[in-house]
């Protein structure tokens, strides 16, 4: 799985 968090 790939998790991308952009803020």
UniProtKB/Swiss-Prot annotation:
cAM373 induces mating response of donor cells harboring pAM373. This is Sex pheromone cAM373. Keywords: Pheromone. It comes from Enterococcus faecalis. The N-terminus is possibly responsible for specificity of pheromones to plasmids. One of its GO terms (molecular function) is pheromone activity. It comes from the Bacteria.
């Amino acid at each position: 799985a790939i998790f991308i968090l952009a803020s």
